[in-house]
Amino acid sequence: MKVLAVDYGTKRVGLAIGDEELKIVSPKGTVSSKEAVKKIKEIVEKSRVGKVIVGLPLTPSGKEGQRAKLVKDFVEKLREELPNTEIILWDERWTTAEAMRRLEGLPPKKKKELKDVISAMIILEEYLNSV
């Protein structure tokens, strides 16, 4: 089954796609937050995605803060547009730090450009490793 991972941000949303059986993850790019629901719906329909994994930004202690509420509001919009697609919230603590580690050595502009999609790939890698 194809799986799409989403790293939601207030400006940009990182996307990655993968396969549950093959455990392969590929970057799908970034979209603006304003266009994210529409673009995700297009990808789900075009690529026959069966699950969407959305990173939930918990605090280091595991609690939900203001950013988690924004993500949950976004997920509700996704669920309205994709009623037949399973949408899973996934603990994304430390994914940005790991993404920045992977991007070490790149110019700051390139890091900013790639951070969200790399974070989405990490979310998907973690999910696929758990199933």
Swiss-Prot record:
One of its GO terms (cellular component) is cytoplasm. It is found in: Cytoplasm. This is Putative pre-16S rRNA nuclease. Pfam families: RuvX. Keywords: Cytoplasm, Hydrolase, Nuclease, Ribosome biogenesis. Its main location: cytoplasm. PANTHER family: POLYNUCLEOTIDYL TRANSFERASE, RIBONUCLEASE H-LIKE SUPERFAMILY PROTEIN. GO terms for biological process: rRNA 5'-end processing. Belongs to the YqgF nuclease family. It is an enzyme of class 3 (hydrolase). Could be a nuclease involved in processing of the 5'-end of pre-16S rRNA. Its EC number is 3.1.-.-. GO terms for molecular function: nuclease activity. The lineage of its organism: Bacteria, Pseudomonadati, Aquificota, Aquificia, Aquificales. InterPro entries: RNaseH-like_sf, YqgF, YqgF/RNaseH-like_dom, YqgF/RNaseH-like_dom_sf.
